[in-house]
Each structure stands twice: as structure tokens, then as C-alpha cells.
Amino acid sequence: MQFRVYSGSDGQSHIEELNLTTSDVFQFPSAQGEELVFRRDPMPGWHNCPRRQFVITLSGQAELGFGDGSTQLLGPGDISLMEDYTGQGHTTTVVQAPWLSIQISVALNAQVVSQ
């Protein structure tokens, strides 16, 4: 599944499902990757994303938690567009270890989903 995590006007992070096509995900010529990170362990506690990025779960499972009490389970192949730069942020808890993800930073002005 594909998700977008973003900061709302209420100061909370929210999640919505994205319906990306293969061409949306793998072909975005206006987007220039800025950094590529492989992460084994999540950041502790409440945190914001450090930059606009795709997070793709490679193995294991992690659960994102939000200020309203909602959660979202991420498993292998799940893609999240992380855009919650401000506010309370979200939590990330490993449910099935090892949780390995790849983080692909994307320029702020890059169009990465269909308009």
C-alpha cells in the first residue's frame, strides 16, 4: 500500500492512502533525489520527518502512531511519502524485527504524485 503522512493545520500528523501507479512511483523526472538512507531502527519517541522523503519498508513490520490515537502498520513493499515537517510528528514502533527500510529524499518542489 502507499501512504502520505503530512502535518495538518491542527498541529498533528495525519495519514492518507495514496493510489500511485507504477509510473507515478518509478518515473518522476522532475524529482531529484537528495539522499539515500538505509535505516534498520526507527527514531525513538515523537518525531517529524527530517526532510521530504519516501520510506519503503524492505523487511519486518513497523507501526506509525499519530496524535489522534490512530495507527498504520507498514510491511514489506509499503511506500510512505513523508511530509510531516512540523507539529507533534508521529511515532514509529517496530512490530516485527528486524525492520529495514530505505529512505529516499526528494526535493521539496518535485512533483512525485499525479495531480
Model-derived features with residue positions:
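Short beta-strand segments in beta-sandwich/barrel cores
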Residues: M43-P44, Q61-G65, I79, N109-A110
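Short, Lys/Arg- and Gly-enriched loop/turn segments at beta-strand edges
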Residues: F26, Q72, Q88-V94
